[in-house]
Swiss-Prot record:
Belongs to the ChlB/BchB/BchZ family. It is found in: Plastid, Chloroplast. The gene is chlB. It comes from Diphasiastrum complanatum (Issler's clubmoss). This is Light-independent protochlorophyllide reductase subunit B. Its main location: plastid. It comes from the Eukaryota. Pfam families: Oxidored_nitro. Its EC number is 1.3.7.7. InterPro entries: ChlB/BchB/BchZ, Nase/OxRdtase_comp1.
Amino acid sequence: KRLLQNLGIEINQVIPEGGFVEDLQNLPKAWFNFVPYREIGLMTAVYLEKEFGMPYVSITPMGIVDTAECIRQIQKHINELAVVSLEETVDYEPYIYQQTKFV
């Protein structure tokens, strides 16, 4: 959650954390799905991509390389949708640089 919040991304749902069955109807409102642990939720993300065209990111943000790649995948999906919906694109490279420059 903290990574997404640091990037300024509003979280639609965290499933199954505190969720109700009624909340599932809001899943298609998300721009993409984030599956930080492939063992949990990947099949659901694949289904949502197939049924609703919702892309997903399934890279676990652990370690410098994977965290940077995860953020770049998030950026890619947001920017693809931003072009279609005439929203602003995002550039998370400064964030990645800031988080890794002293490592």
